[in-house]
């Protein structure tokens, strides 16, 4: 433990403090370092990792990506010889993933050993020395990055692996039928603790639309999602459904939200029971079919808390299919998912779209957006500067929003 530093997939499970500076300092304190050294190490860590804006913050008010940065910083401050990172990019926006890549490059130059369990591969291809492929508890292959790039797309997908180059990911052909508008937001302003998060937002959404919501960590995407579902009440402006105003209570009745941290919404003693929890007269045939489609049938009797992060995510997505609500909001539904699980979730969302559901997806996953979304909303600096269709014509703008360069990824 003195030589190995671990960053968990869910950073919340490794926090011991309520503010960021104390969390970064926690490990050093337990080494009984002198107070002055402790202060210097915290300051040096914040400078090295460029997280000065996250200092002296309440951990409970951070976004998922910001929590991930603090978890990494708390390990970096202890200066371990070996880093173990479990899905370190799962909660990060594309800019933060670029920063993570630079942090990994930094500790590699320092002579540290880094082991990363990861499904997103593209940001590691210039850094990794070896790529170890595991299947069912066994090592099935060890590759150099160059050997890994030579794998065909079919072979990579058979192995359940994500794209190694986001420049090779393209949107499908657009739908020719315009959706029927049902949801409208007029001059909506959202606040959190008296601070304006989003200002004067206006948009409409139609039946069957799948709308991506993007922006940097802390841009207000989750607050926007909660407001759509009637869970965030500190707002001005109008929400309309089929041209009629709907207040928080009715939005809550019409909607279902899959949270970024699904541990907050798993209540039952088994996966099967979770899929019908709180639903009157659940359709057992639909429950069985959904479990089968998402590869959850083998786990139907297991307690949800015994599942992996990706499996828990699929359970929450399964509930969204079964609950019968009109408005569905997914907050990072592909966090921690491999290629197979991601395509399963994408297929399920397309089915929900075909059923006429209005779907919003908060995501940083360019590959997933190209498979599922019809348009993308971009939040930045409290505003919504972009509403971009997911089409080949708009591909340059989409790549810009997701920081995918025309040359080598930055």
Regions found by a protein language model. Name each.
Residues 118-119, 363-364:
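H-loop/switch region of ABC-family ATPase nucleotide-binding domains
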Residues 229:
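Helix-to-loop junction immediately C-terminal to a conserved catalytic motif
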Residues 214-216:
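The feature captures the beta-strand-to-loop junction immediately N-terminal to the Walker
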Residues 58-62, 66, 303-307, 311:
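Conserved ABC ATPase signature
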Residues 83-86, 328-331:
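Catalytic Walker B motif of ABC-type/P-loop ATPase nucleotide-binding domains
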Residues 93, 338:
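ABC-family nucleotide-binding domains
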Residues 36-54, 284-299:
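Conserved ABC ATPase "signature" region
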């Amino acid at each position: 433990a003195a030589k190995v530093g671990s960053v968990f997939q869910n950073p919340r499970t490794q926090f011991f403090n309520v503010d960021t500076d104390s969390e970064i300092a926690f490990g050093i304190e337990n080494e009984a370092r002198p107070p002055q050294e402790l202060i210097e190490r915290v300051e040096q860590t914040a400078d090295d990792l460029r997280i000065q804006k996250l200092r002296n913050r309440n951990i409970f008010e951070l976004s998922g990506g910001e929590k991930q940065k603090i978890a990494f910083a708390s390990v970096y401050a202890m200066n371990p010889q070996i880093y173990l990172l479990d899905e370190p990019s799962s909660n990060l926006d594309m800019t933060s993933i670029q920063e993570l890549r630079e942090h990994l490059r930094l500790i590699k130059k320092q002579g540290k050993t880094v082991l990363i369990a990861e499904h997103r591969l593209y940001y590691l291809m210039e850094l990794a020395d070896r790529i170890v492929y595991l299947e069912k508890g066994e090592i099935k292959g060890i590759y150099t990055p160059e050997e890994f790039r030579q794998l065909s797309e079919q072979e990579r997908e058979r192995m359940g692996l994500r794209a190694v180059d986001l420049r090779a990911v393209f949107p499908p052909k657009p739908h020719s039928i315009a959706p029927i508008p049902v949801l409208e937001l007029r001059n909506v302003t959202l606040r959190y603790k008296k601070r304006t998060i989003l200002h004067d937002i206006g948009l409409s959404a139609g039946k069957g639309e799948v709308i991506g919501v993007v922006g940097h960590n802390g841009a207000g995407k989750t607050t926007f999602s909660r407001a759509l579902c009637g869970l965030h009440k500190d707002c001005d402006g109008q929400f309309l459904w089929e041209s009629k105003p709907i207040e928080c209570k009715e939005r809550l009745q019409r909607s279902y939200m899959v949270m970024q941290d699904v541990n907050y919404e798993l209540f039952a003693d088994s996966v099967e029971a979770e899929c019908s929890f709180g639903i009157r007269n659940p359709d057992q045939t639909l429950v069985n079919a959904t479990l089968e489609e998402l590869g959850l049938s083998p786990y139907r009797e297991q307690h949800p808390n015994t599942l992996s992060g990706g499996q828990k995510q699929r359970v929450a997505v399964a509930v969204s299919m079964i609950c019968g609500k009109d408005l569905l909001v997914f907050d990072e539904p592909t966090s921690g998912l491999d290629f197979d699980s991601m395509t399963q979730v994408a297929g399920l969302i397309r089915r929900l779209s075909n059923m006429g559901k209005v779907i919003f997806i908060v995501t940083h996953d360019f590959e997933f957006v190209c498979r599922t979304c019809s348009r993308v909303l971009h939040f930045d600096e409290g505003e919504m500067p972009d509403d971009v269709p997911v089409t080949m014509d708009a591909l340059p703008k989409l790549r810009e929003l997701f920081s995918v360069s025309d040359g080598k990824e930055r």
